[in-house]
């Protein structure tokens, strides 16, 4: 029998597939089969949104079309029969017309690296197809499933807000004041100074949204749905069979025939299990358009919903129902809605089904606890007939008597209405407020006897605290008949803690936090019910006090908004001079249309091979044997490369290409599998058998490294003044320490490379996503034993880097190049997200120990600090990180007597490397923690102590570099004024006095960020500029475009210097073929150094062409170029900048390592929930000295994006390792970077007026890194709020600071009667699931 055809449409074009592989997902099909590369691979698990596309389905029963976003990485193509798929390429392009979403995303400066942009565009596009004038709530909800690492989200919101009603207005729903004009407490915003800045974009330029111009749903698909008789479709391959029944009878028959086969609707549960856990299902049953699975039946008793309805459809249905029915009947519906608003992202909610969510019974399911306490029932069907079972705790535990039978199908779910005197509540706490699995969640229900406040029924279930949803049935039974009072609450907490238990080594860790949440949620429920009883019987039940009422309010954001104050262009500047103007990122349009080409978007090369790595599963072990035989026998496998193949080219410094006889970390490269397809290479890698023998010692933490004296080199040290003598005169001395956790780069584009042998003279071309093409060129040449001039490295753009695409990228490129050279064929290597996070180290975990002497007035007179960074298993950049940390640790403060020492620790973790800020975010936090503790001891505010100790005039740093701190202090004063510090600090105190369970905090942090690379050689740069006879110019330089807009700025430089329109200047990318011997792009100096080289090349050309131009001053560049050609005058010039004068002598502890300093200050105000540890950034004000901004739009983007990345570092980004050194957090489901829900509700960014710096490019300053540190203003604002909570509870003295300040750490620091109730495990009595490193 011939297999059925798969018929669907993509971007209006018909697609027919006769031989469908059921294991094929839509993402690789679009990218490889249809060459639609605008849809990106970001994580492969539906967690980042980079692969978002829109699916449209026609319903012949309702004659309606449903448009919804999905994650293409989790969408099997077999599920697409009869659908229309729209990708970013299908809505607009540069060749025809742009869609308004694409235009506005680009012109509102909403792209940086651009890798996430197509996903953002498609999420917004899908929203507009359903809601042409969305509300702000709908907008933020639609983008909740999309991650961006570069922008900080604010410009994305700005772009999308232009489609909202009244451009995002809330219609005065909040305090009667427009959301766009709100300031503090609804007053008119930001009145101080009222400086005006030119708009970064003009809405008048935007084309209007015209829904009539969208792609129509294919009429053919409508006809098929209307007229074609329904028939089960079966798609199969050698490994898998996909069955798509189209009637309920066929579905029941298929389930009877294949009882072990899972029924999937959205593939959001089965898909990740298949991809990440290696689960394989030979048969999958996927119902398609079965009406009975989508029923909506509302009666007086409740609601019956089809099991096939998507979670987003359920959300819409419940939203409609709660608006129509009395509140007392909709308790369960409202609780479900509360969780549906934060459950996953819009894409997953549109894919996942209600039935799938229930039957999967995941331990952290948000809906199942609520459905269970709500007495829901499940309607089942099999060949034996219909059956109804309760959705009970026994069902969730998969007890045989209460479970589905293998042949049964879940058809629908009955959700009863709540009754009078019945209350249902939902609770959850996650690492991030939205699109994050719950750490603990709960559903709770109570029914009282009529009017008496005496418990008649009680049901409490928890998720996240066991292998499945766990109930407190016995506790509830014992509480029946008890009155609803504090005595009952106290008893309930103790009973529940005794019944719902967690072992100290429970999977997921956070055991004490989870125990605390169990009873914190119970307390919240107690208060919510009291509030409900008050509504039902106001005369009998008193109102909650303000102190208690604060426990009930969730930390929801208001609508996001911002103000920007940047620099005006001088009125004397020529209109055509682009310097200082907010020019759009020149790849912005291509980002938004999907036309921007990244490394893995490059077309396949003839006979291309694919490489994947086998990595170590042990942290410190001897390799006993490697068995390749089984893997080599698999079809399509071409070769497996080990260290033996590389001969003597195995080690570069402390970095090893492939492990030889030992492995030193989990994730170390052991061998590389080469096959004719990516799938076959990955399958074969699983069959490589490596036998290990563990070695001692296993060193994972800094403390263990100190114990074993495991350091890479001897200490680095800087000292000024006489520290020991100064301690003798100090009024007080304190000692403390702070641990700062690591951070994953989480660039959206994973490590990617394509190596192409040229077939002549051993030449080889490397197309790679890197910051340092020269380094790759050198290592590949050494590995292949070629001269460097035969190895060329090309980089068009990089989808984010942040320091993470240097060292390990070069290692992987060398191995890939070896494979390509050996086989004479192109080899492609692209890491999956989990591989990338496992192999490549991130920011260094850090430990700072300080001893500080100070006077009673807050003056710090002596400081002795030890810095330790966890370098991992090889040196990489660790020594430089420690050196930069020591050089920059003073931040904004003059410490007259200072000793700082640092060590890079060797451990058995993947080598940590550079990450935006390069040691300063850690070292600066150590200093600020010390200053904060001094303030507490002195009874002063931290801001007072900061002001007292700050550099203020011309001064010397602790390494004897002179600088002027006038601008630093100006930033500080300006920030204190603009943020209305005094008034708001008073308001925070008033709020805290009135609220026991919510607390607010404020912190203002200064910034002095040194910019420089430490030596002249590392700061040199070159450029090449050609002028063609048509008057156009081509510029090449050594910098890498990775989102910061360096190419845009270089074209601005050429335009100014040559007085040539920017439209006449082009830049193709970066290549060692055009500009050799480049330095790495990083350290905030890429535009500085390369811009000066480009400027030099332009000035060389102008000097050369000056006689020609002076003879024809009214001519055009076309005229001048032709004349130059006729006169044999070269139209090409090399520009060169030798580097800033930089030096540091570590033996003497002095030097001039930095060219200039970036100054700034940030004030953040936060609110915390003392019962859950949740926090919300209410407002952030940032003031920056940027010199003279070359492009304010790009510079604001750098400051804002860096701040949000820093905020993530200090609050929610938490790496988790096992005690054996295995990284648990290998993707966005386990590792949380900030999402839209995390950004400040208000954000105000101000640039100081231009200041002159003669040595830099047009007096500009590099801003790529400095803003990261300002994110710690949120950290210290949280600290301030926690301290207020502790003071109110009578807890004095400091508490141990660690970063990040996650919900767990915040909650456990807010000690109260609930934290005292929980059982504690004795240290050493158990093996923890995870450890801090």
UniProtKB/Swiss-Prot annotation:
UniProt entry keywords in alphabetical sequence: 2Fe-2S, Cytoplasm, FAD, Flavoprotein, Iron, Iron-sulfur, Lipid metabolism, Metal-binding, Molybdenum, Oxidoreductase, Phosphoprotein
Compartments (UniProt record): Cytoplasm
Function: Oxidase with broad substrate specificity, oxidizing aromatic azaheterocycles, such as N1-methylnicotinamide, N-methylphthalazinium and phthalazine, as well as aldehydes, such as benzaldehyde, retinal, pyridoxal, and vanillin. Plays a role in the metabolism of xenobiotics and drugs containing aromatic azaheterocyclic substituents. Participates in the bioactivation of prodrugs such as famciclovir, catalyzing the oxidation step from 6-deoxypenciclovir to penciclovir, which is a potent antiviral agent. Is probably involved in the regulation of reactive oxygen species homeostasis.
Assembly and binders: Homodimer.
Residues reported in the UniProt entry to bind FAD: 263-270, 344, 353, 357, 366, 410
GO cellular component: cytosol
Active site feature: 1265
Protein name, UniProt field: Aldehyde oxidase 1
Domain FAD-binding PCMH-type as annotated: residue spans: 235-420
Modified residues (Phosphoserine): 1063
A GO MF label: molybdopterin cofactor binding
Known catalytic reactions: an aldehyde + O2 + H2O = a carboxylate + H2O2 + H(+); retinal + O2 + H2O = retinoate + H2O2 + H(+)
Species this chain originates from: Rattus norvegicus (Rat)
2Fe-2S ferredoxin-type domain boundaries: 4-91
pH dependence text: Optimum pH is 6.0 for nitrite oxide generation. Activity decreases below pH 5.0 and above pH 8.0.
Misc. comment: Male and female rats possess kinetically distinct forms which may be due to differences in redox states.
Residues annotated to bind Mo-molybdopterin: 112, 150, 801-802, 1042, 1083-1086, 1198, 1263
Disulfide bonds: none
Main EC class the enzyme belongs to: oxidoreductase
Post-translational modification comment from the UniProt entry: The N-terminus is blocked.
Tissue: Expression in liver (at protein level). Also detected in heart, lung, spleen and kidney.
Enzyme Commission (EC) number: 1.2.3.1, 1.17.3.-
Binding residues annotated for [2Fe-2S] cluster 1, in chain numbering: 43, 48, 51, 73
Top-level taxon in the UniProt lineage: Eukaryota
Binding site for [2Fe-2S] cluster 2: 113, 116, 148, 150
């Amino acid at each position: 029998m011939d297999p059925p055809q798969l018929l669907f449409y993509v971007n209006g074009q018909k697609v027919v597939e006769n031989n469908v592989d059921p294991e094929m997902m839509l993402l690789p099909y679009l990218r490889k089969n249809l060459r639609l590369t605008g849809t990106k691979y970001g994580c492969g698990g539906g967690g980042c949104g980079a692969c978002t596309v829109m699916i449209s389905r026609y319903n012949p029963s309702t004659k309606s079309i449903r448009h919804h976003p999905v994650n293409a990485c989790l969408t099997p193509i077999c599920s697409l029969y009869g659908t229309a798929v729209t990708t970013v390429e299908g809505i607009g392009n540069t060749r025809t017309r742009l869609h308004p979403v694409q235009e506005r995303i680009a012109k509102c400066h909403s792209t940086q690296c651009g890798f996430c942009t197509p996903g953002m565009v498609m999420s917004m596009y899908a929203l507009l197809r359903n809601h042409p004038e969305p509300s702000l709530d709908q907008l933020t909800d639609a983008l909740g499933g999309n991650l961006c690492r570069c922008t900080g989200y604010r410009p994305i919101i700005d772009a999308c807000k232009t489609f909202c009603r009244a451009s995002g207005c809330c219609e005065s729903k909040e305090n009667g004041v427009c959301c766009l004009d709100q300031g503090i407490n609804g007053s008119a915003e930001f009145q101080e100074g009222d400086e005006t800045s030119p708009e970064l974009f003009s809405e008048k330029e935007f084309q209007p949204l015209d829904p009539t111009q969208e792609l129509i749903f294919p009429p053919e698909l409508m006809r098929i749905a209307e007229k074609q008789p329904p028939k089960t479709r079966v798609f199969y391959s050698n490994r898998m069979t996909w069955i798509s029944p189209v009637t309920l009878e066929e579905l029941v028959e298929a389930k009877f025939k294949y009882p072990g086969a899972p029924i999937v609707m959205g593939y959001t549960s089965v898909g990740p299990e298949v991809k990440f856990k290696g689960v394989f299902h030979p048969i999958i049953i996927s119902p398609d358009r079965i009406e009975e699975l989508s029923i909506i039946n509302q009666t007086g008793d409740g609601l019956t919903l089809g099991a096939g309805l998507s979670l987003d459809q359920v959300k819409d249905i419940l939203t409609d129902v709660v608006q129509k029915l009395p509140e007392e009947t909709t308790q369960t519906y409202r609780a479900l809605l509360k969780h549906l608003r934060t459950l996953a992202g819009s894409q997953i909610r549109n894919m996942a089904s209600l039935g799938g969510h229930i039957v999967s019974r995941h331990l952290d399911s948000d809906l199942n606890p609520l459905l269970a306490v709500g007495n829901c029932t499940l309607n089942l069907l099999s060949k034996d007939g219909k059956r109804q079972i309760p959705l009970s705790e026994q069902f969730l535990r998969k007890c045989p008597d209460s479970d589905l039978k293998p042949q049964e199908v879940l058809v629908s779910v009955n959700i009863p209405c709540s009754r009078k005197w019945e209350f249902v509540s939902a609770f959850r706490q996650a690492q991030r407020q939205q699109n994050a699995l719950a750490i603990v969640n709960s559903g709770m229900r109570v029914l009282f006897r009529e009017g008496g406040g005496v418990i008649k029924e009680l049901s409490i279930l928890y998720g996240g605290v066991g292998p499945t949803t766990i109930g407190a049935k016995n506790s509830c039974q014992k509480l029946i008949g008890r009155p609803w009072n504090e005595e009952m609450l106290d008893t309930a907490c103790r009973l529940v803690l005794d019944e719902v238990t967690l072992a100290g080594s429970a999977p997921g860790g956070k055991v004490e936090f989870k125990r605390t949440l169990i009873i914190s949620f119970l307390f919240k429920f107690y208060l919510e019910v009291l509030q409900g009883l008050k509504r039902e019987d106001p005369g009998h039940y008193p109102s909650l006090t303000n102190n208690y009422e604060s426990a009930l309010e969730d930390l929801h954001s208001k609508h996001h908004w911002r103000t920007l104050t940047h620099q005006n262009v001088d009125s004397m500047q020529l209109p055509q001079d682009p310097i200082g103007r907010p020019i759009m990122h020149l790849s912005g349009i291509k980002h938004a249309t999907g036309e921007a080409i990244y490394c893995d978007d490059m077309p396949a090369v003839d006979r291309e091979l694919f490489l994947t790595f086998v990595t170590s599963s042990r942290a410190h072990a001897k390799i006993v044997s490697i068995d390749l035989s089984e893997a080599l026998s698999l079809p399509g496998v071409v070769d497996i490369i080990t260290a033996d193949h590389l001969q003597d080219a195995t080690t570069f410094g402390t970095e090893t290409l492939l492990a030889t006889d030992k492995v030193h970390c989990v994730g170390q490269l052991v061998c590389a599998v080469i096959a004719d397809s990516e799938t076959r290479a990955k399958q074969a890698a699983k069959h490589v058998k490596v036998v290990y023998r563990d070695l001692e010692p296993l060193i994972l933490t800094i403390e263990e490294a100190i114990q074993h004296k495991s350091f890479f080199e001897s200490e680095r040290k800087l000292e000024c003044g006489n520290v020991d003598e100064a301690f003798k005169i100090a009024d007080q001395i304190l000692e403390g320490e702070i641990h700062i956790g690591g951070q994953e780069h989480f660039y959206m584009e994973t490590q990617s490379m394509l190596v192409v042998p040229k077939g002549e003279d051993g030449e080889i071309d490397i197309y790679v996503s890197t910051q340092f093409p020269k380094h790759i060129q050198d290592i590949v040449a050494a590995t292949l034993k070629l001269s460097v001039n035969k190895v060329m490295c090309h980089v068009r753009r990089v989808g984010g880097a942040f320091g993470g695409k240097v060292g390990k990228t070069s290692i992987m490129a060398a191995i890939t190049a070896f494979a390509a050279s050996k086989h004479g064929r192109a080899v492609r290597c692209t890491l999956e997200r989990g591989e990338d996070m496992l192999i490549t180290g991130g920011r260094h975990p850090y430990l700072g120990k300080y001893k500080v002497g100070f006077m009673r007035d807050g003056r710090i007179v002596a400081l002795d600090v030890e810095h330790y960074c966890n370098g991992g298993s090889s040196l990489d950049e660790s020594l430089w990180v420690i050196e930069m940390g020591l050089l920059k640790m003073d931040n904004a403060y003059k410490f007259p007597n200072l000793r700082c020492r640092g060590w890079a620790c060797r451990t058995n973790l993947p080598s940590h490397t550079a990450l935006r800020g390069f040691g300063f975010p850690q070292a600066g936090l150590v200093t600020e923690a010390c200053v904060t503790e001094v303030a507490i001891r002195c009874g002063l505010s931290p801001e007072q102590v900061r002001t007292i100790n700050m550099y203020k005039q011309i001064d010397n740093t602790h390494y004897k570099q002179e600088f002027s701190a006038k601008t630093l202090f100006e930033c500080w004063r300006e920030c204190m004024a603009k943020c209305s510090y005094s008034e708001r600090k008073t308001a925070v105190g008033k709020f805290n006095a009135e609220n026991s369970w919510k607390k607010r905090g404020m912190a203002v942090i200064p910034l002095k960020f040194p910019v420089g690379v430490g030596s002249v050689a590392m700061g040199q740069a070159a450029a090449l500029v050609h002028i063609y006879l048509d008057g156009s110019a081509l510029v090449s330089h050594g910098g890498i475009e990775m989102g910061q807009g360096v190419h845009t700025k270089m074209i601005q430089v050429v335009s100014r210097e040559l007085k040539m329109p920017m439209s006449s200047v082009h830049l193709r990318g970066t290549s060692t073929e055009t500009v050799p011997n480049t330095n790495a792009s990083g350290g905030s100096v890429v535009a500085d150094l390369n811009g000066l080289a480009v400027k030099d090349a332009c000035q060389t050309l102008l000097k050369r062409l000056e006689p020609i131009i002076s003879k024809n001053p009214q001519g055009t560049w076309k005229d001048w170029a032709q004349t130059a050609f006729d006169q044999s005058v070269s139209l090409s010039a090399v520009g060169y900048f030798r580097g800033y004068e930089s030096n540091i002598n570590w033996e003497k502890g002095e030097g001039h390592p930095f060219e200039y300093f970036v100054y700034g200050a940030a004030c953040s105000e936060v609110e915390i929930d003392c019962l859950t540890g949740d926090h919300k950034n209410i407002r952030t004000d940032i003031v920056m000295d940027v010199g003279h901004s070359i492009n304010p739009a790009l510079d604001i983007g750098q400051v804002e994006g860096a701040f949000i990345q820093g905020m993530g570092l200090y609050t929610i980004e938490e790496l988790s390792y096992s005690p054996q050194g295995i990284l648990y957090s290998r993707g966005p489901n386990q590792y949380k970077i900030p999402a839209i829900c995390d950004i400040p509700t208000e954000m105000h960014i101000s640039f100081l007026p231009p200041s002159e710096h003669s040595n830099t490019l047009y007096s500009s300053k590099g801003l790529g890194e400095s803003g990261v540190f300002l994110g710690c203003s949120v950290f210290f604002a949280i600290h301030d709020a926690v301290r207020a909570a502790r003071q109110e509870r009578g807890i004095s003295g400091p508490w141990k600071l660690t970063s990040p300040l996650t919900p767990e750490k915040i909650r456990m620091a807010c000690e109260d009667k609930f934290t005292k109730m929980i059982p504690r495990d004795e240290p050493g009595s158990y093996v923890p699931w995870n450890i801090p490193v």
